[in-house]
Each structure stands twice: as C-alpha cells, then as structure tokens.
Amino acid sequence: MSMSDPIADMLTRIRNAQVVQKTSVAMPSSKVKIAIANVLKDEGYIEDFAVTEAAGKAELKIGLKYYAGRPVIERLERVSRPGLRIYKGKDDIPNVMNGLGVAIVSTPKGVMTDRKARATGVGGEVICYVA
C-alpha cells in the first residue's frame, strides 16, 4: 500500500528520532523532501543531509541537531495536507512565532521559507511550520 502523505511521514520521523536523541534519521527520498531538508539546513535546524542509493531506492539521511542536550527543532507541524491544502498569497503568508520560527512554503519558484517568499513576492502552499 502506498503512503498517502510522505511529507507528514518525513516530519514524524524527524520528531520521533529527536525524542529518543538519535543523531540521524533515514527515510525514502523525493525531490520535495530534499528541498525541505535543504531549507531546514539553510535555517540551521539540522546538521546536514545526504541522499544515498540503498537496494535500488533513493534514501534521504538527515543529521539531527541538538543544543545543550535538547533538540534544536521544538515544533514541527504539518499545515497543508492531502485532505485540506492550504494556499496563501504573498501578503497572507503567516509569521511563525512572530518571526522566531519559519513556515516552509512551496512556491512556483521552489520550496523556500516564508521570509524569502515574501521578499520574492510569491505565495504558495504552506507545507509546514518549524520552530
């Protein structure tokens, strides 16, 4: 049976791995997951990520980041989902925790943070909130 929401699965794997203080987490890879991991790395929420080939399938391995024994990511919440897509225009993109967190947005110009989407002047699908 195929997975109905692979992005939610990715976020859940990251949350679960951080609860048990894992240094890294592996999952099936896709272009969108790589783009999300790239945004998380650019914003400093994860150490690094790598795509490897395992048994003919691409696998995304994310290195998790901790500060003083606590996970850097405190909140990782899926917003738009297959049953209810959430789209926002450039003026309506939400501020996460008054700018302390980021919203990851899928735009026509690629996956980016809420700040970059506002600066670029594009809206799109709000994938998740990270704080």
UniProtKB/Swiss-Prot annotation:
<comment type="subunit">
    <text>Part of the 30S ribosomal subunit. Contacts proteins S5 and S12.</text>
</comment>
<dbReference type="GO" id="GO:0005840">
    <property type="term" value="C:ribosome"/>
</dbReference>
<comment type="similarity">
    <text>Belongs to the universal ribosomal protein uS8 family.</text>
</comment>
<dbReference type="GO" id="GO:0019843">
    <property type="term" value="F:rRNA binding"/>
</dbReference>
<protein>
    <recommendedName>
        <fullName>Small ribosomal subunit protein uS8</fullName>
    </recommendedName>
</protein>
<dbReference type="InterPro" id="IPR047863">
    <property type="entry name" value="Ribosomal_uS8_CS"/>
</dbReference>
<dbReference type="Pfam" id="PF00410">
    <property type="entry name" value="Ribosomal_S8"/>
</dbReference>
<keyword id="KW-0687">Ribonucleoprotein</keyword>
<dbReference type="GO" id="GO:1990904">
    <property type="term" value="C:ribonucleoprotein complex"/>
</dbReference>
<dbReference type="InterPro" id="IPR000630">
    <property type="entry name" value="Ribosomal_uS8"/>
</dbReference>
<dbReference type="GO" id="GO:0003735">
    <property type="term" value="F:structural constituent of ribosome"/>
</dbReference>
<comment type="function">
    <text>One of the primary rRNA binding proteins, it binds directly to 16S rRNA central domain where it helps coordinate assembly of the platform of the 30S subunit.</text>
</comment>
<dbReference type="GO" id="GO:0006412">
    <property type="term" value="P:translation"/>
</dbReference>
<keyword id="KW-0699">rRNA-binding</keyword>
<keyword id="KW-0694">RNA-binding</keyword>
<keyword id="KW-0689">Ribosomal protein</keyword>
<dbReference type="InterPro" id="IPR035987">
    <property type="entry name" value="Ribosomal_uS8_sf"/>
</dbReference>
